[in-house]
């Protein structure tokens, strides 16, 4: 089935905002419309096995990889590419631009900021290339207001620490500083 043109749809926000849920929802819509879809997830995120799984247990099968270069040949045979945990792929900008220019639809779910509220640079670079950017909020796990930030519970300083509610909380601006 021929696509009407390539595009990049970026879904950003803190942890527990529903980014993976939205990614799965959009990919399933394309599947219902009989588009060939590929979903990719970050290889080091082995919390849920082979697949993208939301915190409420919704799942879609996915190809695990550490580098988007590894799925480029598979990508030639699909029309829609979903990428979860996009912030962990260093070459996501060049990959998405190349694939969108080849007529493919890219749906990328990613954190926009680190636990230190610093930007994931590669995701920020993707924003001006995207046709659609959706910024989701979570619920603050302390005061239950809108949460725009991810707060790490441990004292680790490295950026890439894979985890769920055991390691992170979604928080509002006020509760970030508690």
Curated annotation (Swiss-Prot):
The GO terms describing molecular function are: ATP binding; metal ion binding; thymidine kinase activity
List of residues binding substrate: 115, 159-163
Name the Enzyme Commission number(s) assigned to this protein.
2.7.1.21
Residue numbers annotated as active site: 85
Tell me the protein family, please.
Belongs to the thymidine kinase family.
Its keywords, alphabetically, are: ATP-binding, DNA synthesis, Kinase, Metal-binding, Nucleotide-binding, Transferase, Zinc
Positions bound to ATP? 13-20
Q: Which organism is it from?
A: Myxoma virus (strain Uriarra)
The GO biological-process annotations, alphabetized, read as: DNA biosynthetic process; thymidine metabolic process
Asked whether the keyword Nucleotide-binding is assigned, the reply is yes
Gene that produces this protein = TK
UniProt keyword annotation of Nucleotide-binding present: yes
- Give me the reactions it catalyses: thymidine + ATP = dTMP + ADP + H(+)
Please identify the protein, giving its name as recorded. Thymidine kinase
Q: Name one Pfam family in it.
A: TK
Which principal EC class is assigned to this enzyme?
A: transferase
């Amino acid at each position: 089935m021929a696509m009407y043109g390539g595009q990049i749809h970026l879904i950003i926000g803190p942890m527990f905002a529903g980014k993976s849920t939205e990614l799965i929802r959009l990919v399933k819509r394309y599947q219902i419309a009989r588009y060939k879809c590929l979903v990719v997830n970050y290889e080091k995120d082995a919390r849920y096995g082979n697949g993208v799984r939301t915190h409420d247990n919704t799942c879609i099968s996915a190809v695990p990889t550490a580098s988007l270069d590894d799925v480029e040949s598979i990508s030639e045979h699909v029309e829609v590419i979903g990428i979860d945990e996009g912030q962990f792929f260093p070459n996501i900008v060049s990959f998405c631009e190349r694939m969108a220019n080849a007529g493919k639809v890219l749906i990328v779910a990613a954190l926009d900021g680190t636990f230190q509220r610093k930007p994931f640079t590669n995701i920020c670079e993707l924003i001006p290339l995207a046709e659609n950017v959706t910024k989701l909020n979570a619920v603050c796990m302390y005061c239950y207001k809108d949460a725009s930030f991810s707060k790490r519970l441990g004292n680790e300083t490295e950026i890439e620490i894979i985890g769920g509610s055991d390691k992170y909380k979604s928080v509002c601006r006020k509760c970030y500083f508690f």
